[in-house]
A protein has these predicted regions:
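Conserved short submotifs of the Hanks-type protein kinase catalytic core
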Residues: 80-94, 98
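Protein kinase glycine-rich loop
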Residues: 16-22, 27
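AlphaC helix of the eukaryotic protein kinase fold
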Residues: 45-64
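Flexible N-lobe loop architecture of eukaryotic-like protein kinase catalytic domains
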Residues: 20, 57, 66-69
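Protein kinase catalytic-loop region centered on the HRD/HxD motif
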Residues: 118-130
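Conserved N-lobe loop of protein kinases adjacent to the ATP-binding glycine-rich P-loop
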Residues: 31-38
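Activation-segment/catalytic-loop signature of the eukaryotic protein kinase fold
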Residues: 76
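Activation segment signature within eukaryotic-like protein kinase domains
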Residues: 112-113
Length: 153
């Protein structure tokens, strides 16, 4: 189901617009009316039993991760048979877009690499280890403060 801007889910999350779509789901920018913050809302686009199980597992797993280079998951719910994850909205531009616009200095690239090594080390040392499976420039967002965040689990 495609969510239109202005749609309200659970009388709490107001859809502002679509951020992107991947194989597993669509991600929307939304506004949490309760907490008065912007969030990212991921919709499971494959509502079959295996996909639903995997989506719920992802929600539980990510909700327990706390790291500055990873978004936090703050809610998971089912509405009219459709599953949703709510997570931090990460402000900034993805590296794929950024790299197409300007050259990158060695010091910037090293800082970003350091951020990713820290995030991956954190993920891989969990019990059980968390594997991202889709690390690419489009899934790395550069925040205004210069830190990189790994998104789209």
């Amino acid at each position: 189901m495609s969510l239109e801007p202005g749609s309200l889910l659970r009388e709490r999350y107001r859809i502002e617009g679509r951020l992107g779509q991947g194989g597993m789901g669509a991600v929307y920018r939304a506004y949490d009316l309760t907490l008065e913050i912007e969030v990212a809302l991921k919709e499971n686009l494959n509502p079959n039993p295996e996909s639903e199980r995997q989506f719920k597992r992802e929600a539980r797993l990510l909700a327990n991760l706390r790291h500055p280079n990873l978004p936090r998951v703050t809610d998971h719910f089912v509405l009219e048979g459709q599953q949703y994850l709510v997570m931090d909205y990460i402000e900034g531009e993805d590296l794929q877009s950024l790299l197409g616009k300007r050259p990158v200095s060695v010091s910037e690239a090293l800082h970003w690499a350091d951020d990713m090594v820290e995030a991956l080390h954190f993920l891989h040392t969990r019990t059980p280890p968390v594997i991202h499976r889709d690390i690419k420039p489009a899934n790395l967002k550069l925040q205004p403060d210069g830190n990189l965040v790994l998104v789209d689990f």
